[in-house]
Design a protein with these regions (language model features):
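Terminal helix-turn-helix DNA-binding modules in bacterial transcription factors
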Residues: 142-181, 203-204
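Short hydrophobic/aromatic patch on the recognition helix
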Residues: 60, 136, 140, 185-186, ...
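Receiver (REC) domain active-site loop signature in two-component systems and cognate sites
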Residues: 4, 42
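C-terminal output helix
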Residues: 55-64, 68, 76
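The feature encodes the CheY-like receiver
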Residues: 5, 14, 23, 35, ...
Length: 204
């Protein structure tokens, strides 16, 4: 609700959306303020949806379902599994906030920079990202639908793909260079992710 004691809904929404720890959380503003200027202020604060009172529970449920569906599509786009029709949707329909884009970019850069690190796990990443382990876990789960370690593995596999297809490394070289210490494990992970073995993929 926009009109609340101590901090109004606009201020709360802005605080949520400007904090990288919570910026991925969808926000619906519910209010009796229905002027164009009020709505502009609401969306400028980062709100994902704006409903004016009186409103129906059916409409609210519909908005919630739509927002959750958009979040699922965003998650698929982040991890590279979006359907063609999702990729082609207008930017305003499926998009990350600048703060969340920067978070994903930074997380990916840190993984790539430390890809040969023996303990490249969530505690290590939390320290590098200046977040608590629980906050980082929730953030990644909210954005990607994956656990932190699952997302790290996807980044490593994508790196291995680049090394094989663009840099000409063989399977063993790509496995070790992308942070896998066991080539057999790498092959299994690769096939699970891409549907074929790494050697078959590179022969396409």
């Amino acid at each position: 609700d926009i009109m609340m004691p101590e901090m109004d809904g606009i201020g709360l929404c802005r605080r949520v959306k400007e904090d990288v720890r919570t910026s991925h959380i969808p926000v619906i503003l519910l209010t009796a303020k229905d002027s164009i200027r009020d709505k502009e202020e609401g969306y400028d604060s980062g709100a994902d949806s704006y409903l004016t009172k009186p409103f129906s529970a059916t409409l609210l449920n519909s908005r919630v379902r739509n927002l959750l569906d958009m979040r699922r599509k965003l998650a698929r786009m982040i991890v590279g599994k979006a359907k063609d029709e999702e990729r082609g949707m207008p930017a305003g329909e499926v998009r990350l906030s600048k703060l969340d884009e920067e978070f994903i970019r930074r997380f990916t850069d840190v993984v790539t920079e430390h890809i040969s690190q023996d303990k490249l796990d969530i505690p290590f990443m939390a320290d590098k990202m200046n977040m608590s382990v629980s906050t980082l876990y929730r953030k990644l789960k909210g954005l990607t639908g994956l656990s932190g370690n699952e997302f790290i593995r996807k980044i490593k596999l994508k790196r291995s793909l680049y090394l094989m297809t663009e840099q000409g490394l063989n399977v063993t070289e790509a496995a070790y260079s992308s942070g896998f210490n066991d080539v057999g494990h790498f092959r299994r992970c690769f096939k699970e992710e891409y549907g074929v073995s790494p050697s078959k993929y590179t022969k396409r």
